[in-house]
Amino acid sequence: MTFLIAAAGTGGHVYPGLAVGEALVDSGVRKDEVLFVGGDRLEATVYPEAGFPFLQTVLRGLSRSPSLETLTLPAVIWKARSTILEEIRRRGTRVALGLGGYVTVPTGMSCSRAGIPLMLAEQNAGAGLANRVASRWAQRTFVSFPNTMGLGTGEWVGNPVRKPLASFDRETLRAEAHARYSLDSSFPVLAVFGGSLGAGAINEAVASMAQSWAGSTFQIVHLTGRRHIDDLADLEASDHLTWRRIGFEDRMDLFYAAADLVVARSGGGVAELTATGSPSILIPGDFGSSGHQEANAAFLETSGAALVLSQADVGSLGSVVGDTLFDSSSLMKMREAALAISRPRAADTIASAMREAIS
């Protein structure tokens, strides 16, 4: 028996896919029985480094508006479909999972032609275009929010997170996290994360705050993204705070363990915030699937787990941080609210469903 997981593009698709693959292995499936499919972006590095077989196809995203590229898109999708279908038949693949992004559509077409079950996992409160298209071929759909829009009835299981976050224990990790970032346990910590690609607008707002801060002392652990680290490396922080800048972090459990409050985008990665019980200030991005980051942020805000700051108001970040980071009562309520809506075992649930489909 073999399994196929199609997830490509940004970390919001890639890492949930990896979490499901690792959950399959934990359940007794061999790594060589789990085939990952994607393109040439983040997935082309992450999956092979994790020890999984990887099929790379030539792909590009689905355009939402007419263009010259739109005219050639059917041929690109059809070629990817043929490549994936050939591999499904060669390996004897029995079930597939698509996690959105451009690879999901040709995967769905391949599953339909091969006659094997397709499952979908949607990371956002508003389904992306690829998952909406692929839903016509899906037997089961798993969603990360209770009222996900665009996919009809889905099973609310949460968004898969990797084992270190699914079994997260802040108190156990706290001392190690402080040591990793050379932090002083006497002062609160603001952790900043712009996603797998970083976030330029958030980085600029944090840099402005760090250089001009004149309030109570605190510390910043700033995950800038590799493409932005050089832009910020030489800037000096105010005397009232410590500012640690990091391009990439492979121990996100320690990143969240260090944090008293997190500033982040509100893509599918909000599942990590809820799994770790991290109070947050969310700044929805105006890219990707239409309005999905706003919808994700609104759910956490309504649940009491986060505050939401619009992109247009990002200049007021310092004021919001000052009002929140030193309010231990509010932080505790936000932490409890985040944990209340978390579904940290999503990867295990989806892996179990995939195994059941071929039993």
Task: Please state what every model-predicted region is.
Residues 3-8, 30-76, 157, 228, ...:
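Conserved nucleotide-sugar phosphate-binding/catalytic loop shared by glycosyltransferases and other
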Residues 35, 112-175:
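Active-site-proximal region of nucleotide-activated glycan assembly enzymes
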Residues 41-46, 173-179, 183-261, 294-297, ...:
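Donor-nucleotide binding loops and adjacent catalytic segments primarily
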Residues 66-95:
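An amphipathic, basic-hydrophobic alpha-helix
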Residues 93-95, 249, 257-270, 278-279:
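Acidic donor-binding loop of glycosyltransferase active sites
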Residues 303, 308-309, 313-329:
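C-terminal "capping" alpha-helix adjacent to the active site of nucleotide-linked donor transferases
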Residues 330-344:
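A short, well-ordered alpha-helix in the C-terminal region of glycosyltransferases
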Residues 343-359:
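C-terminal alpha-helical cap of glycosyltransferases
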